[in-house]
């Protein structure tokens, strides 16, 4: 079984599109900036995308939708 599950992630965000956008942006930040460490204490994943998903499920990442 994958961690975190898609169900637990969808409880935190409003759509799969938002999930992909937020996690990809955070993963890019983790990969490009060595001084930025993970926001979770000890991530289970070694890959930046997995770490970003763990941060989302543990409420370390927030997003704000801009109205147009």
From Swiss-Prot:
Disulfide-linked positions: none
Catalysed reaction, written as an equation: RNA(n) + a ribonucleoside 5'-triphosphate = RNA(n+1) + diphosphate
GO molecular function: DNA binding; DNA-directed RNA polymerase activity
Pfam families xref list: RNA_pol_Rpb6
Keyword annotations of the record: DNA-directed RNA polymerase, Nucleotidyltransferase, Transcription, Transferase
Enzyme class: transferase
Enzyme Commission number(s): 2.7.7.6
A GO biological-process term: DNA-templated transcription
Gene3D superfamilies linked: 3.90.940.10
Gene Ontology CC terms: DNA-directed RNA polymerase complex
InterPro entries: DNA-dir_RNA_pol_omega (IPR003716), Pol_omega/Rpo6/RPB6 (IPR006110), RPB6/omega-like_sf (IPR036161)
Family assignment from sequence similarity: Belongs to the RNA polymerase subunit omega family.
Subunit structure: The RNAP catalytic core consists of 2 alpha, 1 beta, 1 beta' and 1 omega subunit. When a sigma factor is associated with the core the holoenzyme is formed, which can initiate transcription.
Cited function: Promotes RNA polymerase assembly. Latches the N- and C-terminal regions of the beta' subunit thereby facilitating its interaction with the beta and alpha subunits.
Annotated NCBIfam families: rpoZ (TIGR00690)
Protein name as it appears in the record: DNA-directed RNA polymerase subunit omega
Protein's organism: Halalkalibacterium halodurans (strain ATCC BAA-125 / DSM 18197 / FERM 7344 / JCM 9153 / C-125) (Bacillus halodurans)
């Amino acid at each position: 079984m994958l961690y975190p599950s898609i169900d637990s992630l969808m409880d935190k965000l409003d759509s799969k599109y938002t999930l992909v956008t937020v996690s990809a942006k955070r993963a890019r930040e983790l990969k490009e900036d060595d001084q930025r460490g993970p926001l979770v204490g000890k991530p289970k994943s070694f890959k930046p995308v997995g770490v970003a998903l763990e941060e989302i499920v543990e409420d370390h990442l927030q997003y704000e939708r801009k109205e147009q």
